[in-house]
Amino acid sequence: MFSPRRLLVAVPCLTAALAAVLTAAPAASADLVSLSACNSNTLSRYFSPWADPAYYELAPGGSFSDSSWTLAGGATLVSGGEPFAVLGSVSPNSLSLPSGASATSPSTCVDAAYPDIRFFVAGSGTVGVNVIYNGTVIPSGVVPAGGSWMPGPITVTGSAITGAENGGTAQIQIQLVGLSGNPEVSDVFIDPFHGG
């Protein structure tokens, strides 16, 4: 039987193992992953009020102001979102993810410089964060909802791995899955510099 607690333990262990494999590679292969950003989107310190000084960019369709994400299993766009106006105004929409529902972003370019995903979450239950690369769903983390709107913890995209496999850059999709309860998600961001 699936247990969110087991996933909370398994994901960091898998990430650490993959990082160890990558860092153990010969020095000659160290230049396989480009450290340049895939694009030149606007970066800002959206989470600085919560002691996160990293620069982030909005993921494609990450404000849920349009219907660019693919929704399945009862996922819906609903009125209201994070009240902190990190994008300049209060978010008018959010994503409702009842248990079993999923939402998948449009494709976006990542490389070793795009390691983290972060978003705002409210409601109850948990959200699974996956990265889809080359048709493979890669679990990246579990984000708990705690009632009112707050930033969720940082989850890892695995972009160094996908970028290394694909010659420097890769096209991925972000998939959010309702694992339990009825969480809501607002404003999905990618950190292109891993905390700096």
Which positions does each model-derived feature cover?
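Short beta-strands within extracellular/lumenal beta-sheet-rich domains
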Residues: 87-116, 126
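Hydrophobic residues on conserved beta-strands that form the core of alpha/beta folds
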Residues: 61, 105, 116, 151, ...
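C-terminal segment of classical bacterial N-terminal signal peptides
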Residues: 17-27
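Extracellular carbohydrate-recognition regions
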Residues: 31-78, 189-196
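Bacterial N-terminal signal peptides that target proteins for export
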Residues: 2-12
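Short, surface-exposed beta-strand/strand-loop-strand elements in extracellular ectodomains
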Residues: 128-135
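Extracellular carbohydrate recognition and processing domains
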Residues: 50, 135-169, 175-184
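Solvent-exposed strand-to-loop "edge" motifs in beta-rich extracellular domains
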Residues: 65-69, 108-114, 118-126, 177-179
